[in-house]
Each structure stands twice: as structure tokens, then as C-alpha cells.
Amino acid sequence: MGEGHRLPVASPRVAAIVPAAGRGERLGGGTPKALRALGGRPMLVRTVESLRRSRLVTQIVVAAPPTLVDAVAQLLGGDVYVIAGGAERVDSVRRALRAVDDDVSVVLVHDAARPLTPPELVDAVAAAVLDGHPAVIPVVPLADTVKEVDADGRVVRTPPRDGLRAVQTPQGFRRDVLSAAYALEDIAVTDDAGLVEALGVPVTTIPGAQEAFKVTRPADLVLAEALLARCDPADDARSAEARSAEARSEEPQFAGARSTDARSGG
């Protein structure tokens, strides 16, 4: 169906962007990370369902691997607008931002690999932006001590842990602020809030949620499966079936996934 798949949405004010075009090499396997099975269902499906359950999100835009736009659109349903993502995450978010409806005033950017994020956290971020904060990020305290090291691996200093936080998503922004941030060039950052910081815009933090961790490595996937099984025994059964299917075929549902050009776009 070409560029994307869109259904009219009545007066949206809050849009959620999900960059999901990346390969996720650290997680292993040939399937794009967002489409890896979790509890018998692709992670992306669970991530989008969390956004659907939000009281405030009125539009969802997903940037998918270019060769899988139609398949992902069919997987997610007609209320989600699916576009072709870019070669890098920043390209995917920039494309998705252009696809957001004109009357949206708040944009959330959410990692596809945070499938257990509570809808309440999504609403808390959106509400904080709607209340007047130009940029809002959820954070959690660090459990581990952090060391700064030099190029040779020697410890340079140990920053006080009390002032450090791990950042989660969704990250929320006034639309004009995020658009201005993505107009910047040659800025190397690891998250959307970093771009906004480069503009000199204040970024506000709110408490995150332990369940909103990012599934990046195989151990994260095991933890996510365990949490799902604890919450819903039926998911544990589906997980076993999914692992069996993956053992029979490395890419049971998305056989064409390896041909995508977007290797790190989500």
C-alpha cells in the first residue's frame, strides 16, 4: 500500500511515535528486534497495545522496516499509521514526525523494545507535557555504581549515584520543540531528550516504572517472559509455543525480514 496506512482520527492532540525499523543485533536472531516474539506475540504488538490503552494518546505512528511496511500494518491494525523507517533511529523519528497529524500538539517517542511499559506511565508523561512542561522524560534510580573510564579502560572518576538516573520512554515533547530539535544537524545524542537539551530547552523528569525496561539482550527477553508469566499464566504457554516455533524456523512469521535496509532505525 505504498507510503503508509492511515485511518482518520478525530481531533488528535497527543501522538505517539514508535521507531521500529532497527535490527537489534545485540538481541541475536535474524528477525528485527521489534518483531521478536514475547509471550507468543511480537514485542511491537505489545508495545502498541500499551499505547492504545493510554487515555491521552490519540494517534500512533510506527516506523517499520521498509520491506515490511505492509506486513506490520496488517499486524497492528488499521488504527495505527505505519510508515517506512530510515537507516538510523533519528531518520525514523524524523519521518514519523512528519507523518503526525497537523492538529497534534504533544508528541511522545517510545521505544518499540519496551513492551511492558504501563499505560499509566504513558499518560503521566503526556499529562506533564499538556500541563506546560516542554519536554518530559521518565526516569528510575540507578541500582549499580557508575564509573567514568578513559580510552584505556582506567577509571577517571566515580560520579555520585544520588544525582544519576536511568532514562526510559516514552519521552514527551511539545510538538514545536521536538520539530526544532530534529531540525538540528550533526548532533550526536542517544535519546530524543538529548536533542532537546541541545536547544537549551529544560527537560523535566517524572518517576518511571520498573516494568518499562528495554529488551536489548537475551537476558532481558528472559526477564520479560518471566514477568509476563507471573502476570498471566496463559502468556507462559504462548511463550513455550513461540520458542518451539522459533526452534523450527528462525523467522517463522517474517521470512523477508533479512532483506530490510534499515539496520539500526529503531
Curated annotation (Swiss-Prot):
* Start-end of Basic and acidic residues biased regions: 234-251
Which species is listed as the source?
A: Frankia casuarinae (strain DSM 45818 / CECT 9043 / HFP020203 / CcI3)
- Keyword Nucleotidyltransferase belongs to the record: yes
Read off the InterPro entries from this record: IspD (IPR001228), IspD/TarI (IPR034683), IspD/TarI_cytidylyltransf_bact (IPR050088), ISPD_synthase_CS (IPR018294), Nucleotide-diphossugar_trans (IPR029044)
Q: SUPFAM superfamilies given for it?
A: Nucleotide-diphospho-sugar transferases (SSF53448)
Positions of the site: Positions MEP for the nucleophilic attack? R161, K214
* Molecular function, one GO term: 2-C-methyl-D-erythritol 4-phosphate cytidylyltransferase activity
**What is the protein name given in its UniProt record?**
2-C-methyl-D-erythritol 4-phosphate cytidylyltransferase
For region Disordered, the annotated ranges are 234-266
The record's listing under Gene3D superfamilies reads: Spore Coat Polysaccharide Biosynthesis Protein SpsA, Chain A
For this protein, the Enzyme Commission number is 2.7.7.60
Which GO BP terms sit in this record? isopentenyl diphosphate biosynthetic process, methylerythritol 4-phosphate pathway
Enzyme class at the top of the EC tree: transferase
PROSITE patterns per the UniProt record, alphabetical: ISPD (PS01295)
Gene name of the record:
ispD
Q: Which UniProt keywords apply?
A: Isoprene biosynthesis, Nucleotidyltransferase, Transferase
Give residue numbers for the site Transition state stabilizer: R26, K33
Function (record text): Catalyzes the formation of 4-diphosphocytidyl-2-C-methyl-D-erythritol from CTP and 2-C-methyl-D-erythritol 4-phosphate (MEP).
